[in-house]
């Protein structure tokens, strides 16, 4: 090369600064340099393949399309060669040094702002990532339209370009020779190279070959003289057919020696599964592929392999696991388990925009033909293509869930693991809300052994039933004895049991299903009734008006109103909330939130309605007591407060002052045991309460009224 003319050029200030920044970085994940260089090689191969479509002669200079990695341990040099389009002298000068790419400055600004070095590909300057591991580089390149040239730099302010008269003829393509830093020699090791290629470039469309040196055993003659004699003997014509057993015995003696041989090993032999026809792929192949990308030891529950063609092209294989991850809804958990490839080049497995959070349990691969390769391979920013891919993924996964639902056993397994995700989807995804609602399953008053779907519920509705009714609570045991169920059971209306905390969030968004309104029976609502029932109710309202007024006066601000209820049967009273506030169950959930906003709690905890049942003996007797003794009577007040606290508990609320409630119950217990001494009463509850005085035996009269 000494005789060839050496041209020296200066880097633009920005590129010089960029190389200096990269070469001195303390960034630990330096392996991404290999991903970037393989990606560039793949791009170059794409270009020559595209040219060859219209002009096949372009491939004559090097018919084989490949990427080859050659570790030269003795020289501490890593070579990466491709048979792509190559670069002319002008390309080498302009593209690698004198014309600043638009992304150069942007990348440096991003780095200064704390961005990850691995984002380098996003800015179109991935080539310079080689300076993460090397401080000197040669780029040998041959384009079909030019001679072979060498571009060389040590990351200073200058680079040279020389006509190459000494290196191996490439035919066509580019070879990078990276002179590795002393602390980066691991990238000459076969194991490390294979590890990085498997992680980042396993599904590149072109063969990635690694030149490896292996030690093999070989049989050789015992002496040199015998070796030469054997060679001479080989040149003589042989009549093997007349060779007898005696001749075989006279064969020369050999010995076994070890010697090093160089072989080329293909690292990405397994062609991308998603590029194959689904009908040609066995379930075992899908299972093996799933395990390789998910680290799961179980087979997947279901797989969806599809391609989208037209204005947008992409292929995907998506898997539904059998189990939910243990950290499914932790805030710091990775929100996406789908590997994104662009034309078989791995981009990222952390593109949160690729899939909604409620589908974060889905694992798989998406390979796009349309996304640009120079997007970040770690942090893809949102763009229109990604939105379309996301929309298609959601659609296909809902299809898959519906297919799973056709097998009851499979669906039970799926629903146990991922029902929360479906409900989160209903809460967040307005477009697919109704489709997801078809997947919901609940126990109910008519289906206590097996969960029922909303669709099946609708088919069982009596003709005069207009709404879908549900009750929320902490557990099945808690809700199935609720006083709110009585009136609906009497009308033969089915009520769904919703006992998962996320159910209520989902229902606030779902609102209706198949044109039927979803109604929480713990809140205020209109129950279907006949004309006769309406007339009877209006009569009862007038009859019990003095009692409702008296109870409201006693309870004060604890309730918004007291009403005569036609929705209670056996229970004497219940507490209902307004339509737009929190239910008792939601209030319980929100109180359990450690970081809750207390201002929101006071706003959303709607005023309570105290409902009384005119058919209850207790309410009938209380009405008489009020009419006889008036609302100011101590016994009336005491019984009203006890009745209210009991209704709070049976309606799913918690008591603000449980000690007061316990005091009243203890007084009734004492009375039942004929303990009516003042000193004993004081021992049970030493501190007087605002609603019960210790200087008169109110408990006795209270007990009489209860009886």
UniProtKB/Swiss-Prot annotation:
Compositional bias, Acidic residues, is annotated for 222-232
Q: What is this protein called?
A: Heat shock protein 90 homolog
Q: Residues that bind ATP, according to the entry?
A: 40, 82, 101, 127, 377
InterPro entries noted in UniProt: HATPase_C_sf, Heat_shock_protein_90_CS, HSP90_C, Hsp90_fam, Hsp90_N, Ribosomal_Su5_D2-typ_SF
Anything noted about its domains? The TPR repeat-binding motif mediates interaction with TPR repeat-containing proteins.
Family per UniProt?
Belongs to the heat shock protein 90 family.
User: Whose protein is this, by species?
Assistant: Candida albicans (strain SC5314 / ATCC MYA-2876)
What keywords were assigned to this record?
A: ATP-binding, Chaperone, Cytoplasm, Nucleotide-binding
CDD domains named in the record: HATPase_Hsp90-like (cd16927)
What PROSITE patterns is this protein classified in?
A: HSP90
Q: Which coarse location class describes where this protein primarily resides?
A: cytoplasm
Annotated stretches, region: Disordered: 216-257, 676-707
How is this protein organized at the quaternary level? Homodimer.
Q: Which domain of life is it from?
A: Eukaryota
Location of motif TPR repeat-binding in this chain is: 703-707
**Subcellular localization(s) per the UniProt record:** Cytoplasm
What would be one Gene Ontology cellular-component term for the protein? extracellular vesicle
Pfam families, per the entry: HATPase_c_3, HSP90
GO MF annotations in UniProt: ATP binding; ATP hydrolysis activity; ATP-dependent protein folding chaperone; unfolded protein binding
Q: What does this protein do?
A: Molecular chaperone that promotes the maturation, structural maintenance and proper regulation of specific target proteins involved for instance in cell cycle control and signal transduction. Undergoes a functional cycle that is linked to its ATPase activity. This cycle probably induces conformational changes in the client proteins, thereby causing their activation. Interacts dynamically with various co-chaperones that modulate its substrate recognition, ATPase cycle and chaperone function.
Asked if the keyword Nucleotide-binding belongs to this entry, the reply reads: yes
Biological process (GO) annotations held by this record are: cellular response to heat; filamentous growth; filamentous growth of a population of unicellular organisms; negative regulation of filamentous growth of a population of unicellular organisms; nuclear receptor-mediated steroid hormone signaling pathway; protein folding; protein stabilization; regulation of apoptotic process
